[in-house]
Amino acid sequence: MQYQVDTHTHTVASSHAYSTIHDYIAVAKQKGIRLFANTDHGPAMADAPHFWHFVNLRVLPRMVDGVGILRGIEANIKNIDGEIDFFGDYLKQLDIVLAGFHEPVYPPSDKATHTEAMINTIKSGKVDIITHPGNPAYPIDIEAVARAAAEYGVALEINNSSFEVSRKGSEANCTAIAKAAKEFGTILVMGSDSHVAFSLGGFARAQAIIDEVAYPPSRLLNRSPSALLTFLAARGHETVADLIPLFSDDEPCC
């Protein structure tokens, strides 16, 4: 099954990634991806783009050759208070805000601290999707996080890269997250976390977990471009208003 939406990609602006926006568009056309988010690492990461990179994302076209582009960021959770490394009115210029734990910015500590930091990030209202919450380096109280995400309308990511490239040992945690999300009504999204365009839309391992727990397709943000855009608009991203009409006739892939 080919999903048409990918919410998590990195370009050469993050210097440990290897593809340009043009590369992603070309691969998206080949694979039938209709909408993807450009979400380079937040500026607190050592090799992340400069702050101005995110401010200037408005120069990106909305649509190129039938492929929609979301202007976003994968911000870094900085502390137990759930603060991230992007702020203020600049957040309103973005279409989508992801955030997660990254060792160079917020080193692992203990389960209680990780849980409090993640829940505070969810409660902040600044973040739409929590990335790779199944990372075994950052154990969390999965049920507490899933409940908070459901309450505040924040999506949890099942990160496909965690099974193939990094964060090895994530399978059990991600399965538990998917089960908790099913139980508590939490929104899920699959993210490729592509650092090279060839893996855009690669969700095979994440999809296996979604299928294993019989998570409802109606709550999966990848199901259609309009599903993701409606979610983002409901979360206050007025910037997606000009994209919504371009996908008004789409049909869920599943």
UniProtKB/Swiss-Prot annotation:
Zn(2+) 1 binds at H8, H10, E74, D193. GO terms for molecular function: phosphatase activity; zinc ion binding. Zn(2+) 3 binds at E74, H102, H132. Its cofactor is Zn(2+). GO terms for biological process: bacterial-type flagellum-dependent swarming motility. Its EC number is 3.1.3.-. It comes from the Bacteria. GO terms for cellular component: cytosol. Zn(2+) 2 binds at H16, H41, H195. PANTHER family: PHOSPHATASE YCDX-RELATED. Belongs to the PHP family. This is Probable phosphatase Shew185_1467. It comes from Shewanella baltica (strain OS185).
